[in-house]
Amino acid sequence: PVNAGFAEYELKMGSIQTILANTARHGTGLDQVTASLEELNTYADKTIYNFGDMTKNIGLFTNAGIKVDDAASMIKGFSNAAAASGTSAQGAAGAAYQLSQALSAGTIRLMDWRSLTNVGMGNKNMQTGLIEIADAMGTLEANTITAEEVQGDFNGSLEKNWLSADVMSSYLKIMAG
């Protein structure tokens, strides 16, 4: 128990350094990072996802240029979406890595989407939520595609680059509850 507690503390300290380095340009301070990690730790205690996975993922998301508060909310939403689809902690970790790369690039492409579907996350519920958000944000119209076309061929529609980082971020924040 003592070693486990120390290991978690050590992980938290390393994560704080990484997150501060990734978010310094946003004016993020130690108190803000610590509060976000505490929130995720409390959340992790209530789910099958451990604090180590959460801190690794927040590091990935902040490295993609996302502010720490937004990243913490998105990680909770991602974990909720993973849990709702029955995704394992290991599957979610791999998908989170791929998603962080896509968020950094600004667009979720088919290969990124497949990383979600391969672990069971890219289901109809997620697709519907993303389509509704993209439609409300005007992203579909801006990319000359309709919600009906996306619903008809979700995977093929991703070639139109309508699934932006902003759409996915909004979806994950909503899923955070």
Task: Locate each region found by the language model.
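Small-residue helix-packing and pore-constriction motifs in hydrophobic alpha-helices
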Residues: 1-44, 53-64, 73-84, 94-176
